[in-house]
């Protein structure tokens, strides 16, 4: 199973009123199909278990996993430009005149259609986890745009998806700055050795620290000068490490070896059973972490 590396968390404002069978059917209506010769991009649902599964959702209790696949045809701008230039020069030579802007635009479309069947494909996939117990949608992505694109696919699939990014009562950057300044963290959390500090004003600069003692005079000087901590590496309960960001996203998640080895007693040949056990383990850990992060940031804003 692919363990999540980055998560963006969204609040469901209305329960998804579908049974799991109905959800499976809805996803099947937008199952992934490869690009045809004239498609630039295609997106759809595939099994979270990849080629080893057929179901488009994986369910464990009230936790549901889905996977969106995207295919993009790669046509470098330089290739299009050169092919267009060759065609324009040929036509202008034959007709003895300069082509109009609209004519060049039409030619460009023709060039793209001609090149598309020979273009390479780039594939990507994004996992989406529905926590129907806590009414959260968690996207395995560090990019807000990519997350929103995949939520748009889910919204199209379901007909409606009223979600908003998780918001907190306290400022994330103010809280992280307080932790670094004081060296005192909430129970269960430990400072690691990486952070990013930014000044409120853009011209104030950015400081990125790696392998750095964060509770130090050097870092304190930057904070006193008006910089805020915008990214902070943390350890939680010796079970996982991550980077907390000022937008509330949790990135570069690394589960401890001890945690990941908990299901090693399951025969690796039994892919489905191991996938399910790892899914239960991962969602349980991340669900507890999300709940704790909400708590230490003053609760969820209404």
UniProtKB/Swiss-Prot annotation:
Transmembrane segments: none annotated. Its main location: cytoplasm. GO terms for molecular function: double-stranded DNA binding. The keyword Cytoplasm applies. One of its GO terms (cellular component) is cytoplasm. It is found in: Cytoplasm, Nucleoid. One of its GO terms (biological process) is DNA recombination. InterPro entries: RdgC (IPR007476). Keywords: Cytoplasm, DNA recombination. HAMAP family: RdgC. Belongs to the RdgC family. May be involved in recombination. NCBIfam families: PRK00321.1-1, PRK00321.1-3, PRK00321.1-5. This is Recombination-associated protein RdgC.
């Amino acid at each position: 199973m692919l363990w999540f590396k980055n998560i963006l968390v969204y609040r469901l404002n209305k329960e998804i009123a579908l049974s799991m069978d109905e959800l499976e059917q809805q996803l099947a209506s937008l199952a992934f199909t490869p690009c045809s010769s004239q498609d630039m991009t295609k997106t759809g649902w595939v099994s979270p278990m990849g080629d080893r599964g057929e179901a488009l959702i994986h369910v464990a209790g009230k936790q549901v996993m889905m996977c969106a696949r995207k295919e993009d045809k790669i046509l470098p701008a330089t290739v299009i430009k050169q092919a267009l230039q060759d065609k324009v020069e040929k036509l202008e030579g034959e007709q003895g005149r300069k082509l109009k802007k609209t004519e060049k635009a039409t030619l460009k479309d023709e060039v793209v259609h001609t090149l598309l069947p020979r273009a390479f494909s780039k594939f990507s996939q994004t996992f989406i986890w529905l926590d129907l117990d806590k009414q959260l949608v968690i996207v395995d992505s560090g990019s807000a745009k990519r997350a929103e694109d995949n939520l748009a696919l889910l919204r199209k699939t379901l007909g409606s998806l009223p979600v908003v990014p998780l918001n907190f009562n306290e400022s994330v950057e103010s809280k992280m700055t307080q932790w670094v300044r004081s060296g005192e963290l909430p129970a269960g959390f430990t400072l690691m050795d990486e952070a990013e500090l930014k000044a409120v004003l853009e011209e104030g600069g950015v400081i990125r620290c790696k392998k750095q003692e964060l509770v130090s005079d050097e870092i304190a000087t930057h904070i006193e000068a008006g910089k805020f901590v915008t990214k902070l590496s943390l350890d939680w309960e010796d079970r996982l490490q991550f980077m907390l960001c000022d937008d509330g996203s949790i990135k570069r998640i690394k589960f401890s070896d001890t945690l990941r080895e908990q299901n090693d007693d399951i025969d690796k040949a039994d892919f489905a059973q191991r996938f399910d056990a790892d899914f239960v383990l991962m969602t349980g850990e991340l669900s507890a972490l999300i709940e704790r992060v909400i708590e230490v940031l003053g609760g969820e804003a209404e």
